[in-house]
């Protein structure tokens, strides 16, 4: 057994508890240690520069008035869209942020500005109405005039939906609206449509765009004409079994319910479901219902059930005895109750730390969640309960037994102590491109795969990785659980990705006459904000996420190469595994002697890989071996090599 946190971190947590969870009363060295280990929520001003230096996202832990404008601008520019947690700090600094055109783009895209802000932006000539419409049409000031050329320009650079949203807010001539409809098939949902009094033209437009609310913009004189009402009824009937809510709403204001029911028959109850008229079973003879009516009822069975369960039950019996079965879900599905533990997530669980028993369960389930300190401090519990929870947290231990490799505990304890220092960072890209130009692809044989492995691991040591090494969704290994709000390792994403493991999906194993895409990038240059939701970045911090991504990519490299080799042949797999482990350790500058210390049962691994490929069974033994290898690598990178896991390949004896 070993402690989850180092001795110094445990001491800092105890000091924090004695201070009553007050960072102001804590010695600065202990406060910094807690910040490094992600145990904080709100911070006093004295830690600003230190916290910002670790991770720019940490500035959100300070009061809005403390946050420096330049730091806020840098953070805003890194994010594709601003989440709700930025609302207060942006409100505090909005006056100064609105003077920067690039920042204004982000604020408009994220709906973080009001109409009064938009007026100031236009008055100060930061943005024009057209530029605002290109970013977010819903923020254009109502009544703003737009010419035909401006509307066309917006359509060409955005989409038809954006133009339709723009129509709700702008003033533009009717000829512009009709031109855009004729040339680009953009629905004329604009107030100027009331100028059109040609009934045939209006009917044509409604038929062409039945799902849009064109009828709301039609001239009242046109609507009052009898032939117009009859045409709308015809359009509604012709569209069945599809429903046009806008047309249905309007026609229900023109005709009384009884007349509508007589006009539409059994369709009435679904077309006008908001009209409170009972559905009596004796009003309709099921034997007289047509095939189209039956399909319509099946499609909207839920609406009919709300009107009358008796009608629906009788309808089901009618279908049953007539031996009529339809693809729609008409008959209730029989479900069987399964006994399973209710899945819960850390954010919801830590809202209430009611008692010590609950606390023990939560801390045990989520002890490998790097944001657990934040969740404890951010809970609604009293300070006494939070202090008890932190006291339990600093006493958490990790089991060093082999079997416990599966719960990621060992790897987690190694990663939180790991401080990455990139080697030969300067000009790495030029050297990499030069190497890749000479070695554009690798052969799909043992020599080619092992040569590729040497290249991958030696570049990974420098922090240079390819997160799209396999052409599938990136970051798919089970290690990503370490930045997931779950108490169990989820293998779903991993198993989905393994279906795509084949030589054709490895960029560097393609035919020699094909060009390859060089996706290698230093881990510091990877745009984490595009890969992950910002809530996770804010919780776990950029630095820890990069550590997990590095470990994840190493796992993906090794596992993918093993599968590729096994798919080609299982002959002499033991020798290949030995050399692959050797190349991996050597690439990270770790003593090659350690590759003889990995215990593997070749027969078990072959059976696992066969089950994975054919039956999609999780390969737990292979997963465990790779976990041991990762722990060995990061222990050595941490400067700890005394107690590395022993991994030796054996053909017959099972030791894992």
Swiss-Prot record:
List the record's Gene Ontology CC terms alphabetically: membrane
Q: Domain of life, per the record?
A: Viruses
Membrane topology label: Single-pass membrane protein
Q: Name one Pfam family in it.
A: Pox_E2-like
**Where does this polypeptide localize?**
Membrane
UniProt keywords (A-Z) are:
Membrane, Transmembrane, Transmembrane helix
Sequence intervals crossing the membrane: 544-564
Q: What is its main location?
A: membrane
Q: Return the similarity comment.
A: Belongs to the chordopoxvirinae O1 family.
Protein name as annotated: Protein O1 homolog
């Amino acid at each position: 057994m070993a402690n989850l946190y180092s001795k110094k971190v445990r001491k800092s947590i105890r000091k924090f508890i004695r201070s009553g969870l007050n960072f102001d009363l804590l010695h600065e060295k202990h406060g910094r240690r807690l910040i490094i280990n992600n145990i904080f929520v709100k911070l006093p001003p004295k830690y600003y520069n230190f916290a910002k230096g670790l991770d720019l996202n940490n500035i959100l832990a300070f009061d809005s008035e403390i946050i420096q404008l330049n730091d806020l601008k840098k953070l805003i520019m890194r994010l594709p869209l601003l989440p709700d947690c930025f609302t207060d700090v942006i409100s505090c600094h909005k006056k100064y942020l609105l003077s920067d055109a690039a920042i204004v783009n982000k604020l408009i895209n994220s709906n973080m500005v009001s109409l009064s802000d938009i007026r100031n932006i236009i008055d100060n000539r930061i943005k024009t109405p057209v530029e605002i419409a290109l970013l977010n049409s819903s923020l254009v000031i109502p009544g703003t005039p737009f010419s035909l050329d401006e509307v066309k320009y917006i359509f060409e650079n955005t989409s038809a939906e954006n133009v339709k949203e723009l129509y709700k807010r702008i003033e533009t001539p009717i000829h512009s609206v009709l031109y855009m409809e004729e040339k680009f098939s953009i629905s004329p949902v604009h107030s100027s449509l009331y100028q059109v009094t040609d009934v045939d033209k209006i009917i044509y437009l409604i038929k062409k765009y039945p799902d849009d609310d064109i009828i709301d913009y039609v001239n009242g004189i046109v609507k009052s004409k009898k032939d117009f009402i009859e045409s709308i009824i015809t359009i509604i009937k012709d569209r069945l079994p599809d429903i046009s809510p806008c047309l249905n709403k309007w026609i229900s204001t023109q005709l009384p319910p009884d007349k509508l029911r007589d006009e539409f028959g059994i369709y009435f109850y679904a077309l006008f479901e908001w009209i409170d008229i009972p559905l009596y079973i004796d009003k309709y003879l099921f034997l007289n219902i047509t095939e189209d009516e039956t399909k319509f009822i099946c499609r909207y069975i839920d609406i009919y059930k709300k009107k009358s369960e008796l009608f629906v039950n009788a309808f089901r019996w009618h279908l049953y005895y007539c031996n009529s079965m339809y693809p729609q879900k008409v008959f209730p599905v029989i479900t069987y109750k399964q006994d399973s533990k209710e899945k819960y997530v850390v954010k919801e669980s830590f809202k209430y730390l009611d008692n010590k028993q609950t606390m023990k369960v939560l801390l045990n389930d989520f002890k490998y969640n790097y944001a657990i300190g934040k969740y404890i401090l951010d809970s609604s519990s009293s300070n006494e309960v939070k202090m008890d929870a932190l006291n339990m947290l600093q006493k958490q231990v990790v089991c060093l037994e082999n079997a416990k490799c599966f719960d990621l505990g060992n790897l987690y304890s190694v990663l939180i102590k790991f401080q990455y220092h990139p080697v030969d960072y300067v000009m790495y890209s030029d050297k990499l491109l030069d190497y890749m130009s000479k070695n554009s692809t690798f052969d799909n044989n043992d020599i080619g795969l092992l040569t590729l492995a040497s290249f991958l691991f030696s570049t990974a040591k420098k922090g240079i990785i390819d997160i799209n090494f396999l052409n599938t969704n990136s970051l798919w290994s089970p290690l990503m659980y370490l930045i997931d709000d779950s108490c169990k390792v989820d293998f779903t994403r991993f198993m989905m990705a393994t279906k795509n493991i084949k030589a054709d999906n490895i960029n560097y194993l393609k035919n020699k006459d094909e060009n390859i895409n060089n996706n290698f990038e230093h881990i510091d240059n990877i745009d984490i904000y595009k890969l992950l939701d910002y809530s996770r970045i804010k919780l776990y911090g950029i630095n820890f996420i990069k550590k997990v991504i590095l470990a994840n990519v190493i796992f993906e490299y090794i596992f993918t190469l093993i599968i590729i080799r096994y798919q080609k042949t299982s002959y002499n797999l033991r020798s290949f595994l030995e050399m692959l482990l050797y190349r991996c350790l050597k690439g990270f500058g770790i003593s090659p002697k350690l590759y003889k210390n990995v215990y593997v049962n070749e027969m078990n691994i072959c059976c696992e890989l066969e089950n994975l490929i054919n039956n999609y069974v999780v390969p737990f033994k292979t997963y465990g071996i790779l976990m041991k290898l990762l722990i060995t690598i990061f222990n050595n990178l941490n400067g700890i090599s005394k107690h590395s896991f022993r991994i030796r390949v054996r053909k017959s004896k099972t030791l894992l």
